[in-house]
Structure formats: structure tokens, C-alpha cells
């Protein structure tokens, strides 16, 4: 994607839509799913590098969510789970498979 990409504005707007309505991720047409999967793969790799987070397969995690999993307070996210924008997650947490965490939720694992 370059600034000359005619679809750049569309993709950026669609990312915002997915951030707040992540269930739409699984119904994307193949041409849109390709860029969305790469966007998610890049963000999830960054998140796992920065925090003690493990992420299952086929998940959607909004980059506008706040995920804090410092050492000793891990967060595990199961397969086919989505986390929408403006959520705050603070480990330790074990989020199962096929869990929907919609926007503006706060989950705190409490004391370790």
C-alpha cells in the first residue's frame, strides 16, 4: 500500500469499522481478507513481542484495544476470539475459544 493506492482511504476506513465491529472480519470478501489478515498478523506479532501474550489461530485484535500483560501477568487468547476497540485487558487472563469482547470492556486479572 502506497499513498498512490486508490484503495488506501477505503482500507483505512474499513480498519476503523473492523476495530469497532470485529465480527465483520470473518465475513470479508477474499480480496479484502488478504490485506486484513496481513494487518492482523503484523499487529499480533508486535503485541506478542511487546507483552507476555499468546494468541490463538484466526483471532482479531483491534490495535485500538489496550493490552497489558507484563512479566508474570500473561494473557492467553484462544482461537477464533475477537477483541474490539477501546477494551482494556490486564493480565493474568485466560480468554477461551470463540470469545467476543466488544468495545469498551475492561478485564483485569486482579492480584497475582
Residues covered by each model-derived region:
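Domain-scale signature associated with acetyltransferase and cell-envelope carbohydrate enzymes
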Residues: 1-112
Amino acid at each position: 500500500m502506497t499513498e498512490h493506492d486508490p484503495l488506501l482511504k477505503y482500507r483505512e476506513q474499513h480498519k476503523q469499522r473492523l476495530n469497532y465491529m470485529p465480527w465483520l472480519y470473518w465475513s470479508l470478501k477474499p480480496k479484502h481478507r488478504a490485506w486484513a489478515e496481513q494487518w492482523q498478523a503484523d499487529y499480533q506479532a508486535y503485541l506478542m513481542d511487546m507483552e507476555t501474550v499468546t494468541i490463538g489461530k484466526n483471532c482479531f485484535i483491534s490495535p485500538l484495544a489496550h493490552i497489558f500483560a507484563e512479566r508474570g501477568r500473561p494473557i492467553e487468547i484462544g482461537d477464533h476470539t475477537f477483541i474490539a476497540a477501546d477494551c482494556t485487558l490486564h493480565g493474568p487472563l485466560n480468554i477461551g475459544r470463540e470469545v467476543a469482547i466488544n468495545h469498551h470492556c475492561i478485564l483485569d486479572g486482579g492480584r497475582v
